[in-house]
Amino acid sequence: MQPTLVILVVGLTPSLIGEDTPNLKRLCADGGLRPLATVTPAVTCTVQSTLATGLPPSGHGAVANGWYFRDLAEVWLWRQSNRLIGGEKIWEAGKRKNPDFTCAKMFWWYNMYSSADWSATPRPMYPADGRKIPDHYAEPLELHDELDAKLGQFPLFTFWGPVADISSSDWIMKSTLHVMETRKPTLALTYLPHLDYNLQRLGPDLDHPRLKQDLREIDACCGELIEAAEREGRAVIVVSEYGITNVTDAVHINRALRQAGLIRVRPEEFGREILDAGASTAFALADHQIAHVYVQDPARIGEVKALIEAMDGVEQVLDEDGKRAFGLDHPRSGELVAISKPDRWFSYYYWLDDAVAPDFARTVDIHRKPGYDPVELFFDPAIANPKLAAGWRLAKRKLGQRALMDVISLKDTQLVKGSHGRPTDDPNEGPLVISSKPNLLDGDGPVEATAFKQLVLDHVFS
């Protein structure tokens, strides 16, 4: 077996490889690069599940970064159990082919209770006093303590949120190096999210000095991994899930459904409104540039479809035939799936008056919000000194007081300059595959995301 390293570099596209990415540029020159024909929605959980299983969303069930759990009548995003994902995974196929095959899965999603030999994933601690304490989950248990002892606490707050930066990717890179050195897995999978942050904050402005710095930083992380892989005699594959393209503002799909009388809310927390998904006739789970629209009354699907199609910023709305064409015909999908125009994205906002927005709307809270919220990448522009404000709230928490980290805007959706999820129009702005083995990446056309699993196995077993 040929030991192999797969580096998932979020948001990396052919257009981003150049003078600021010398290590990746060298890998392309010595090996090969092909576009990746990704799936829809082109979002983290969906694409990673396709890369790992070789199946479309209709086969593995990760129809977005979350979905409406119909039996619970609740929306849940960013679940972590690998048992939610159907299909045979890369590492299971490898072990079936050779029982000596091993796999380390470092920070890919759905990474708890996985059948991979070694794994690690973000997993904060939530004490009853309301704090969120950075931590990670690792299998086996001793790996957790090894990584903490070697690298310190996982930097959760730089993994996502308004202060997200290179330190989380650097920690993941070093944890991967440790596992490669100490466990010698046949296949090592790692995930570097750094480009995701400023590409959404700033858009893919290749002349922006901050983005050029980001490219140099992520290339340095990749360089350390590639150097270690070459030292260990590993093949190297670099892959991305999606490309991030320019956007101007959000489409407030749930507000339109609310105004049409299709969404029900319940007043809680001193009059603040909470989405009552189970009692709503129709609501949308917004996830970047797609939205799953769940319609409880089949007789009203046509009415809801027409309403959404008429909204400014909506490109198309998939019904059953449309979902089948996109590989989204799965029971977890909404009755309808909306896709935005290239320069727009969907917000989850369902309230019509900011005074009654839920308290979590002003915080980084990926689990309570019934949809993805890229505005979490920004401090509220209305706060004069946001870092001081956040520090004061954090100090109160450390003193044992409950304090709401309400430092995120709930209305400045125009802050977001980059998004993803819909099919990318220009392959140069879309995801890619790079391989150190050009003979395994021959041809000029795109690599189908559903073919990536076999491509990895070919690297290991050819």
Language model: regions and residue ranges:
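Acidic, His- and aromatic-enriched active-site or binding-groove loops in soluble protein domains
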Residues: 121-149, 210-220, 255-274
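Secreted, luminal/periplasmic, and some membrane-associated catalytic domains
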Residues: 19, 37, 42-43, 67-83, ...
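Short, structured active-site-proximal loop/turn typified by the sulfatase FGly-forming signature C/S-X-P-X-R
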Residues: 15-59, 104
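Short glycine/proline-rich, acidic loop/turn segments that cap or connect secondary-structure elements
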Residues: 415-435
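Glycine-/proline-rich flexible loop or hinge segments
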Residues: 5-9, 29-35, 43-49, 66-79, ...
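His/Asp/Glu-rich, glycine-adjacent segments
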Residues: 55-205, 280-285, 289-296, 300-303, ...
